[in-house]
Amino acid sequence: MRPSGRQPDQLRPVTLTRHYTRHAEGSVLVCFGDTHVLCTASVLPKVPPHKKGSGEGWVTAEYGMLPRSTHTRSDREAARGKQSGRTQEIQRLIGRAMRSVFDLSALGEHTIHLDCDVLQADGGTRTASITGAFVAAHDAISVMRKKGQLTGEPIRDFVAAVSVGVVDGVPVLDLDYPEDASCDTDMNIVMTGAGGFVEVQGTAEGTPFTRTEMDALLGLADHGIRTLIGLQKQALGL
């Protein structure tokens, strides 16, 4: 039995609350159990230097954790004067995940800037961020469409992410913090609605994992992400 009482193939309770803040073109509070992340999508009338004059847009992301989102307070990265390697890795992952399902040429020379701020962390903050950020980006696209800022349909598919791992020899879906801290294997999987893999991040924490275990983890991730994309569609009324 898992610490949470869940079955091996069971997600934590997941909610996606749209229009959570007032000013951003898209905003979503995403909750994977006790992991809560605020995802906002801002539409900016500019693109990075490598896109200027191309007629194409860009989608990028920033990620951060509130000082007391974890058990003990951590300093703000702004106070330290630099971002950690972990923060940089996660925000690049979020950006790649979003761009995998966007037609940038349909955005014109606009940037969708996603901000994912972890309010409370209990494992899986990057996967929750990706899942919530897509819904926020979808709402931002709706605002752009109403304003006539699009040159086509930029969203080609849905995208979501989930963690999987081997805990006490058992492959499980959507690890919370106690499981993440004690697992033998930890993976973060990003997939599209069509079932394509965008990213597979996997690490053995001590005991190498087998091909059989890896196949089981990918199967769990596929099951979980299909459920998450269903919840995204439900939240968007699609």
Swiss-Prot record:
GO biological process, one term: rRNA catabolic process
Pfam family, one: RNase_PH_C
InterPro entries, alphabetized: ExoRNase_PH_dom1, ExoRNase_PH_dom2, ExoRNase_PH_dom2_sf, PNPase/RNase_PH_dom_sf, Ribosomal_Su5_D2-typ_SF, RNase_PH, RNase_PH_bac-type, RNase_PH_CS
Binding site residues for phosphate: 86, 124-126
UniProt EC number: 2.7.7.56
Chemical reaction(s) catalysed: tRNA(n+1) + phosphate = tRNA(n) + a ribonucleoside 5'-diphosphate
Disulfide cross-links: none
Annotated keywords: Nucleotidyltransferase, RNA-binding, rRNA processing, Transferase, tRNA processing, tRNA-binding
Region: Disordered, residue numbers: 67-87
Origin superkingdom: Bacteria
Subunit structure, interactors included: Homohexameric ring arranged as a trimer of dimers.
Role noted for this protein: Phosphorolytic 3'-5' exoribonuclease that plays an important role in tRNA 3'-end maturation. Removes nucleotide residues following the 3'-CCA terminus of tRNAs; can also add nucleotides to the ends of RNA molecules by using nucleoside diphosphates as substrates, but this may not be physiologically important. Probably plays a role in initiation of 16S rRNA degradation (leading to ribosome degradation) during starvation.
NCBIfam families assigned: RNasePH
Family affiliation: Belongs to the RNase PH family.
Protein name: Ribonuclease PH
Organism: Ralstonia nicotianae (strain ATCC BAA-1114 / GMI1000) (Ralstonia solanacearum)
